[in-house]
Amino acid sequence: MKIDLTTLVTESRNQASEQIDVLSTVEMLTVINKEDQKVALAVEAILPQIAEVVDAIAVAFQCGGRLIYIGAGTSGRLGILDASECPPTYGSNPDLVVGLIAGGHKAILKAVENAEDNRELGASDLQDLGLNEKDVLVGIAASGRTPYVLGAMAYAKSVGATVATLSCNPNSPMTELADINMTPVVGPEIVTGSSRMKAGTAQKLVLNMLTTGAMIRTGKVFGNLMVDVEATNAKLVQRQKNIVIEATGCSETEAAESLSQCNNHCKTAILIVLSGLDAKSATDKLTEYNGFIRDALANS
C-alpha cells in the first residue's frame, strides 16, 4: 500500500539544509541551531490549547483519573520519559501518568517492525490498561497519521475519555478524533523526515508543560518548589531539607527535625514549621485541603 507523505510538513525538504553535507562542522551545527530556535516559537503559538489540556488533566487527577500518553517510536519514548519522571519529582503514584509505546517495552530500545501500523493494537493496549471516562489520553505522533495512535484515540473516544493530540502536521487524521488539538508546526526537518529532531523537541517541551502544569494545579508545587519530592537517594534527602529551608526560612537543623517528625514528607514538614502544628495535625490539615499548602496554612 502506497502512503502519500508529500502533504506532510514533517516530510518536506528544508531549503536551509539542502547543502548541509558540504558545510564545515560549525556551519552545519549553526544551521541546526537556527532551526531549533523555531521550536519554542511554534510551541508558544499553541499555548491556549496546551492550557486547555493541562486543565483537563488536573480535573482528571482530582476525580480519580489518569493521564495516558500513547505513541510509536520517538513519540512513544518521549511519553514514557515524561511519565517516568513524575513519581520521583512529584511523589505521584506510578499509575497516575502512564506512557505506552507501539510494540511494548522492548520498543523503547529497539524498533519493533510494523507495530505502529497496527490500529487494533492501539485499542487493545488501552483496553489492557482499563482506560475509562475519567482518563485523559494524549495521542503523540509527529505525522498525525500513525495507525497505532489513531486506533487508540478511537477507542478512547468510545469509552468517553478526554482525547488530545500532539502532532506537528496541521489538519492531520488525528485532529478529527480529538477533543483538543496541540499542533506545534515546526516546519521541515534538517534531515528530511527525521522527526526525532525539531518535532521531537517540540513534543518534549509540550509534555513538560502538561505534567508540570497539572502537578502545579493539583498542589504539588509551592512557590516553585517541588514539595512532594520523595527522598530516594542522598541528593534528594538534601534537596528535601533545602526545600523546607527555602519555603520557611528555618535552619537546616529545624528542617531536618521537622522532616523526621513526618516520615520525611516535605510538604508536611513545611506546614509544621510555618503553622506550628504537630505532625498529625499538619497531615490532617493537608488532607482537608487536598494537599495545597497555601490553603492549609490560611486555615490553620
From Swiss-Prot:
> Which InterPro entries does the UniProt entry name for this protein?
Etherase_MurQ, Glucokinase_regulatory_CS, MURQ/GCKR, SIS_dom, SIS_dom_sf
The EC designation for this entry is: 4.2.1.126
- GO terms assigned for molecular function: carbohydrate derivative binding; carbon-oxygen lyase activity; ether hydrolase activity
Is Lyase there in the keyword field?
yes
The protein's UniProt keywords, in alphabetical order, are: Carbohydrate metabolism, Lyase
SIS domain boundaries: 57-220
Lineage top rank: taxon: Bacteria
Q: Does the keyword Lyase apply?
A: yes
Mind telling me which SUPFAM superfamilies this protein's record contains? SIS domain (SSF53697)
Signal peptide extent? none
* GO BP of this protein: 1,6-anhydro-N-acetyl-beta-muramic acid catabolic process; amino sugar catabolic process; N-acetylmuramic acid catabolic process; peptidoglycan turnover
Give the EC class as a word.
lyase
- Family matches, as NCBIfam families: N-acetylmuramic acid 6-phosphate etherase, PRK05441.1, PRK12570.1
Something else known: A lyase-type mechanism (elimination/hydration) is suggested for the cleavage of the lactyl ether bond of MurNAc 6-phosphate, with the formation of an alpha,beta-unsaturated aldehyde intermediate with (E)-stereochemistry, followed by the syn addition of water to give product.
Per its database record, what is this protein's job? Specifically catalyzes the cleavage of the D-lactyl ether substituent of MurNAc 6-phosphate, producing GlcNAc 6-phosphate and D-lactate. Together with AnmK, is also required for the utilization of anhydro-N-acetylmuramic acid (anhMurNAc) either imported from the medium or derived from its own cell wall murein, and thus plays a role in cell wall recycling.
- The protein here is known as N-acetylmuramic acid 6-phosphate etherase
List the gene name.
murQ
